Design a protein with these regions (language model features):
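Sec-dependent N-terminal signal peptides of Gram-positive bacterial secreted proteins and lipoproteins
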Residues: 2-20
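Conserved, well-ordered active-site substructure
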Residues: 119-136, 142-143, 193-248, 252-253, ...
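Active-site-adjacent helix-turn-beta-strand microarchitecture at beta-sheet edges
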Residues: 113-200
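Short, solvent-exposed aromatic-acidic interface loops
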Residues: 85-92, 155-160, 223-227
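A short, polar/proline- and glycine-enriched secondary-structure boundary/capping micro-motif
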Residues: 91-94, 160-166, 201-202, 229-235
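Conserved hydrophobic/aromatic beta-strand scaffold that supports enzyme active sites
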Residues: 68-72, 181, 209, 282
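Short, glycine-/Ser/Thr-/acidic-enriched flexible segments
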Residues: 76-78, 115, 148, 156, ...
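Zymogen propeptides
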Residues: 17, 21-140, 148-152
Length: 292
C-alpha cells in the first residue's frame, strides 16, 4: 500500500500543471473630465483607427448634392464615449472644438449642443449635473452608464419617461437638450411642429448627429452645408439618411456654423478651413489603452 501511495505521489509531482488562465485586460476610463489616453500613432490610417479597445472607420458619402461625413465607432467600454467642455463646469466660456479635442486626446470628435447658449434644458456632462430644467418643447438625449442612447421626446410625458429610465437602474452620464430626435426604435421620426416653426429644422443647413447602432456601437454624422459641394439638409432629410444607415437612435446636436467633425486632431469636413466657431462643448471618442 505504501509503495502504491509513493508511486501516485511521484506521478502527481511529474504531471505538468495547467497554466493559470490569463485575465483579459479591462479597458475603461474614469467618468470625469480628465480625457483619454494618448492614441497610438501607428494605429491610425488616413481613414481609420484601431487598437484593443477601439475601432473607428471614417467615410464620406455624396448623395443628392449633400456630403455626409460618417464615423463608424465600436468601443470596449461605455466610458470611452465622452464629453469635454470649455473651461470649468458652469462657466460661460467658449473654445475652439479642435483645441478641446486635442486636449483630451480625442480620436474622433463632433460638436455638442452648445449648452451655454441657453438657460433651460437637462444638461449633464461626465456624470455631473449642470442643469435640470426640462423644456417640454425640446427633445432630450441621455447617454446612460451602459453607454446606451435614450431619446426622450418633448411632450407631456417627458418627465414620466425620464423617471422610468432612472427607476430602471440606469444613471445619467451625459444629457443634451437640442434636437430634434430624428430616429427612435430604428424608425425616422417626423419633424415636431415646434422645431419646424421655432428652431429652423425645415431649413437646409449643416447638421451634426450622434446615433447608436447597438451595444457600444455608435455613428457620428455631419451633413456638410453652406459650401459649394454640399447644400445641407433639413432634419427630415437627416432622419431619412440616418434610418438608411440602420441606426436604432439618432439625435441632432447643434448645427449650422457649429457643425464640425474632427479625426486625429484635424478637420474631417470641408466646412472649416482656417477658422472654427468657438463653442462650449464637444462629444468625443477616446482610447482606453495606455500608450506607453
Amino acid at each position: 500500500m505504501k509503495k502504491i501511495l509513493a508511486l501516485l505521489i511521484a506521478l502527481f509531482l511529474f504531471i505538468p500543471c495547467a497554466p493559470a488562465e490569463e485575465t483579459a485586460p479591462v479597458y475603461e476610463l474614469p467618468v470625469d473630465f480628465s480625457g483619454g489616453y494618448v492614441p497610438d500613432p501607428a494605429a491610425f490610417t488616413k481613414d481609420s483607427y484601431e487598437d484593443a479597445s477601439l475601432s473607428v472607420r471614417m467615410e464620406k458619402r455624396d448623395i443628392d448634392g449633400v456630403r455626409y461625413d460618417i464615423a463608424w465607432i465600436k468601443v470596449s467600454s461605455p466610458t470611452q464615449l465622452r464629453t469635454a467642455i470649455a473651461g470649468e463646469p458652469n462657466q460661460v466660456v467658449a473654445e475652439r472644438p479642435g483645441r478641446m479635442a486635442r486636449k483630451v486626446n480625442a480620436v474622433v470628435a463632433i460638436n455638442g449642443d452648445f449648452y451655454t447658449q441657453r438657460k433651460d434644458g437637462l444638461i449633464w456632462r461626465q456624470g455631473m449635473p449642470f442643469r435640470n430644467l426640462l423644456n417640454p418643447e425640446k427633445d432630450i438625449l441621455i447617454i446612460d452608464n451602459q453607454g446606451d442612447l435614450h431619446a426622450i421626446l418633448g411632450n407631456e410625458t417627458q418627465t414620466a419617461e425620464l423617471t422610468a429610465l432612472l427607476q430602471s437602474g440606469r444613471t445619467i452620464v451625459n444629457a443634451f437638450t437640442f434636437g430634434p430626435a430624428i430616429v427612435k426604435d430604428g424608425k425616422a421620426l417626423p419633424m415636431p411642429e415646434t422645431y419646424q416653426t421655432r428652431f429652423d429644422s425645415a431649413i437646409r443647413a449643416p447638421r451634426t448627429v450622434i446615433a447608436q447602432m447597438g451595444p457600444l456601437e455608435y455613428v457620428f454624422v455631419e451633413a456638410e452645408g453652406r459650401v459649394q459641394h454640399s447644400k445641407g439638409v433639413t432634419t427630415d432629410q437627416m432622419g431619412a439618411f440616418m434610418e438608411s444607415l440602420g441606426v436604432e437612435t439618432a439625435y441632432c446636436l447643434d448645427g449650422g456654423n457649429s457643425s464640425i467633425m474632427l479625426f486625429n486632431g484635424k478637420y474631417y469636413d470641408a466646412n472649416y478651413t482656417d477658422s472654427e466657431r468657438e463653442q462650449s462643448d464637444i462629444i468625443y471618442i477616446a482610447t482606453a489603452v495606455p500608450n506607453e
